[in-house]
């Protein structure tokens, strides 16, 4: 202790002419996959970078890395594993197909229900069976932008509010310059593995479930968790939101938005105290993490989507390193990501489980925080991807 201290069926449908279309424009690229530009439409199926097994194709026409020009809180980030990407389409990528994804009905203005805050279980909208597991103080529904920087970097992505989930006290995130470090009673605690269905082990040394669908159900389809998990010694202060749902008719994917921050930076950056966020999907097409960076790392302290760094570190920001975007939050002097958007493909009519989990790694101090918002069923399927929102 530091002194701080997943119906397995396959559906085949043939159409004459026939993938989902959205209101945003999308142009087929050389691999035949429709790819909307990043930031155009936040419905499922936006472009980005996914993780897979062997030689691969990119899922974006823009190979740049977030922050590579040094303009956002400390410049580019070095990742800890080799870049591996892929692009997989399903029925949602067949031109002319009509999408049946339900509309979004925000309803978070009248209460602090965490499911309403992320865009679920609203009247007339998507309904799920949800659980909230962890210390009560690990969950906080926030209204409006987080922090004081202008233009606001962290406004709600749908409705008026978003969910803050923490490995400590989530509401601490609203206190400027606070050193957020609370050891709470986690849903799981004491250096153990995350609860089922999450499995930290990779499905294969060489393949993901995208390259070998027979691996579904044998571990983490993305192969993104184990390497970083093995750097530490188990989960502490674990908190999660999880839901089960039947995928709506003629719906082939979903998306949600997230951002992650950690007090572990800078002192424990690139060490075994690699606090993590995992977005785990349990489905017919995928069992594993769906939120990861372009280099194959989960969303963690040591991952390459760490856009805002408000202190120097000897690895990738040895000089002046500032992130005014974090002003007015507990992460002043620490680090976080931009809003990110994760998308993943699913099968219409199947039952899925989705888990949003955050936890400390190796000990229970120095908090890590995740924002969650804007869950939407969408038109396009394919492999999981995460992009800057």
What are the residue ranges of the model-derived segments?
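Sec-dependent bacterial lipoprotein signal peptides
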Residues: 1-18
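Glycine-centered secondary-structure boundary/capping sites
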Residues: 3-4, 23-27, 302-304, 375
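Ser/Thr-rich, Pro/Gly/Ala-heavy low-complexity intrinsically disordered linkers and tails
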Residues: 19-95
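Aromatic (Trp/Tyr/Phe) and Gly/Pro-enriched flexible surface segments
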Residues: 83-389
């Amino acid at each position: 202790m530091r002194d701080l201290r997943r119906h397995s069926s396959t559906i085949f449908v043939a159409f004459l002419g026939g993938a989902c279309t959205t209101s945003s424009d999308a142009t087929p690229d050389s691999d035949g996959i429709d790819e909307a530009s990043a930031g155009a439409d936040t419905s499922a199926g936006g472009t980005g970078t996914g993780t897979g097994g062997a030689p691969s194709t990119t899922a974006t026409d823009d190979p740049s890395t977030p922050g590579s020009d040094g303009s956002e809180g400390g410049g580019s980030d070095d990742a800890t594993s080799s870049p591996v990407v892929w692009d997989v389409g399903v029925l949602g990528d067949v031109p002319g197909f009509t999408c049946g994804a339900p509309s979004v009905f925000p309803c978070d203005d009248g209460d602090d229900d965490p499911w309403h805050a992320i865009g679920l279980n609203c009247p007339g909208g998507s309904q799920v069976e949800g659980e909230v597991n962890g210390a009560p103080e690990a969950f906080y529904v926030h209204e409006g932008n987080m922090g004081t920087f202008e233009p606001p970097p962290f406004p709600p992505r749908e409705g008026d509010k978003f969910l803050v989930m923490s490995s400590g006290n989530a509401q601490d995130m609203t206190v400027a310059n606070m050193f957020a470090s609370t050891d709470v009673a986690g849903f799981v605690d004491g250096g153990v593995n995350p609860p089922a269905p999450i499995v930290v082990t990779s499905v294969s040394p060489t393949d993901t479930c995208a390259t070998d669908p027979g691996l579904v159900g044998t571990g983490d389809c993305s192969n993104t968790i184990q390497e970083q998990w093995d750097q530490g010694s188990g989960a502490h202060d674990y908190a999660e939101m999880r839901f089960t749902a039947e995928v709506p008719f003629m719906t082939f994917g979903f998306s949600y938005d997230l951002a992650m921050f950690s007090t572990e930076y800078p002192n424990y950056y690139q060490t075994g105290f690699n606090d993590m966020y995992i977005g785990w999907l349990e489905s017919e097409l995928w069992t594993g993490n769906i939120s990861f960076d372009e280099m194959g790392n989960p969303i963690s302290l040591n991952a390459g989507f760490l856009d805002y760094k408000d202190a120097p570190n000897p690895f990738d920001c040895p000089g002046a390193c500032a992130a005014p975007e974090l002003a007015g939050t507990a992460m002043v002097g620490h680090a976080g990501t931009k809003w990110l958007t994760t998308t993943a493909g699913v099968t219409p009519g199947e039952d899925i489980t989705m888990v949003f989990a955050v936890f400390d790694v190796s000990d229970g101090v120095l908090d890590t925080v995740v924002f969650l918002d804007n869950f939407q069923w969408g038109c396009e399927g394919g492999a999981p991807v995460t992009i800057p929102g």
